[in-house]
Each structure stands twice: as structure tokens, then as C-alpha cells.
Amino acid sequence: MHPDDAVLDAACGTGRALPVLRAATGPAGLLVGLDLTAEMLAEARRRGRGELARLVRGDVTRLPFADRSFDVVFASGLVSHLPDPDAGLRELARVAVDGARLGLFHPVGRAALARRHGRELTADDVRSEPRIRELLTCTGWQVTRVDDAEDRWLVVAVRRERP
């Protein structure tokens, strides 16, 4: 990230990532935290994170922002909770400028999370590398990094140029 970037924290929840994102953008950068639930945003405000970012209630599949509004899109824990990951990732691409960076994050890797929940890892899991690469490619993103470690799952992508 660069100072002065316009950054969207999609599905920001209580705003846990907002202090780090604000530090990266500096005081002049635009920082927006979006979440579906009023309760999560109220908790973010209670924790003082409304002073760091503009907090907006909204649905990731129908974002209340103009096309090409953000230089960076960050989402922690979002992808596995999207009823239609294709629609959500396509909508994130819509509001991203050409060349924007996308960071998809989860604080636990796939294998560790599967063990924690007593599940088997499957190839059709939305967070599997082949599946997330396919989803992102089909929705306007170019994957530059996939990191699936025990203590994190991180995918970085760049918004492809549009005609």
C-alpha cells in the first residue's frame, strides 16, 4: 500500500484491521470499512475505529460505491462466507481501479482450519489454490501470490486492465 491510497476493508467486522490499514495509507488516504451487520459496525465504533475510517453498512455482492473507487481491497475471512463467491469477487473487481491490489486473508491456514473443524480438505473448497485462482481469474483479477501456511491463508491479486 501507498500513502494516499483509497482502501476498502470489505467485511471489516469490528474493524480489527483498520489500524494497520490506516497506518499504511497515512492520514490523507481514504479508508472505508464495510460490513453487512450493524452490530459489527457498532462494535467497531465503540472501539474507536470509526475515527480511523468511514464505516459503511453494505453487502459485498452489491457495494454502494462507484466503479473504480479503490486502489486496494482487503478482506479477512470473507471468501468462505460468501454464498456466491463469484458474485462477491466480481463486485470487488468492479470497485477496484485497474492495477488495484487485492488481499484475501484468513488467520488460519486451510489444513489447520480443517483439523480444527474435523473436516477433510477438498479440492472444491473455495480457499484451495486451484479454486481461488480460477475464481479470481474469472472475476477480473490476476493472482500474484498464494500463501497457505498453518498460521495464515493469504492471496494477493492485481485487478486486470479493462477495455
Regions found by a protein language model. Name each.
Residues 8-10, 14-62:
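Class I SAM-dependent methyltransferase SAM/SAH-binding core
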Residues 99-106:
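Conserved beta-strand signature within the Rossmann-like core of class I S-adenosyl-L-methionine
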Residues 124-139:
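Short alpha-helix
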Residues 139-141, 147-163:
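Core SAM-dependent methyltransferase catalytic element
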